[in-house]
Each structure stands twice: as C-alpha cells, then as structure tokens.
Amino acid sequence: MARLAAFDMDGTLLMPDHHLGEKTLSTLARLRERDITLTFATGRHALEMQHILGALSLDAYLITGNGTRVHSLEGELLHRDDLPADVAELVLYQQWDTRASMHIFNDDGWFTGKEIPALLQAFVYSGFRYQIIDVKKMPLGRVTKICFCGGHDDLTRLQIQLYEALGERAHLCFSATDCLEVLPVGCNKGAALTVLTQHLGLSLRDCMAFGDAMNDREMLGSVGSGFIMGNAMPQLRAELPHLPVIGHCRNQAVSHYLTHWLDYPHLPYSPE
C-alpha cells in the first residue's frame, strides 16, 4: 500500500477547464481517510496552490514551481532552489530568436512584460494572474524559474538556442507542449519529492505519482508506482515506456484509477 500520492495538476488532476472534478475531490478525501499523504507537484506558483488548498480545505504538501519550492502542510518552506543570478541575467537580457512570451517567477509572484489575456484561462479556478513589469529590472538574485510560452515548433528551436547559451548551467524541460521552462540545475519534481520523502521518513518506493508532461518524468520514473495520463505528451510515454497509461484528464482518470485501487486492490485495472 502506497503511503504518499503525488499529483501533477494541469493535464492530470485538473480537467481541461482547469477545475477539479467532484469525483476527484471525493477520491482525495478517501485517500486522506486511509492516512495516505497527499502531495501536489506542479509548475504552478506556491501562492496560487496555497490559495487553492485553503479554498478546498485540503491538507496536502506542495511541490511548486516544478520543484523550486517544497512546503509543509502548515505552509513552512522545506526546500528552495533558485536560478543562479548569472543564468537569470543571460536568459532575461539575451535577444532570442523566438515569438514566445517570457515569464519570470519569484516568491512574490508571476511577472511578464505585456498583457496576454489568453494565458489567464488556465487560472480561472484560483484567480491567480501575472504582474506587468519591465523584465530588464527584475531582481536577478530572486528568480526561481523562467518560462517561455508559444508554439511547440518555435519553442523547440528556442530550446536549442538556450542549450547552446547555457550549457549545463540550467535544466530545460517542457511542462506542456506550449511551455518551455528554465530551471536550476538538478531541479525537478522527482528531486523535490526525494527531499519531501526524507523529511517524512518515507522512501520513494512508498509513493505513487501521476503526470502527463516532461516535467513529470523524473518523478514518475523514481517512485514505486508511476502512472502516465492517456493525454500525456508522446515524449513522456517514449521516455517511460514501462509505466502504465491510464485515462484522460477530461474523464477524471486519476480518480477512476484510485477508486479501483482503493476498492479492488487485488484485481487488474482497465482505464475503460
């Protein structure tokens, strides 16, 4: 029996309209009744996730910013990882050949250089939003991550440019087909979950995890039971071909699997 369940949010626990379904909320409550520790592991900001947990009265640990922050049930900061100032400076000031928009994150929030209303659709659940600033004036020592949002082909070309400029000084990953992230070296959800399990006196073998994108790769590959969403990025399936694939987030597939796991643990599971 797993003792901790870690969930990605977008494309996994959240439905396509960016809400948590009633079946999902009910299943999370059942897990807590079984004393299974809940952990939300997401690229979203800690401020937003703390608001969501409060609104839903959920007790859960938080891995946010794709592993840049880990918070306890009480909101205590357990782990932090920031981009080196020289890396942040290079990414912010360099002229990249891309049409993608740039977004900067620190403990105070989400910052970008211009209004992009379409991006706010993903935050209807919480009301979290960006702040408009001159990105050249961002404090370089406080940046947790930088991400670029745009078309996938454009971002793939940008990824090559970033690799050439940064080398091994940053970790690059796609958190969605339309979002490329620049993170501290060694920073990912799997590394953050390792920190959390050590804090809790657990091992990664005691954990199950669910995800759909390349920013979930390390987490899914390191836990005792990793599950890939039916709507996952093809690259993730290719990287972890041995992991089982469940259903689509639009059908609350995580809840569907966990209900079977709780009620019929000894029977084989089918996502249909």
From Swiss-Prot:
It holds the Pfam family Hydrolase_3. Its EC number is 3.6.1.-. Mg(2+) binds at residues 8, 10, 212. Gene3D superfamilies: 3.30.1240.10, HAD superfamily/HAD-like. Its cofactor is Mg(2+). The keyword Hydrolase applies. The active site is at 8 (nucleophile). Disulfide bonds: none annotated. Coiled coil: none annotated. Belongs to the HAD-like hydrolase superfamily. Cof family. Catalyzes the hydrolysis of 4-amino-2-methyl-5-hydroxymethylpyrimidine pyrophosphate (HMP-PP) to 4-amino-2-methyl-5-hydroxymethylpyrimidine phosphate (HMP-P). This is HMP-PP phosphatase. It comes from Escherichia coli (strain 55989 / EAEC).
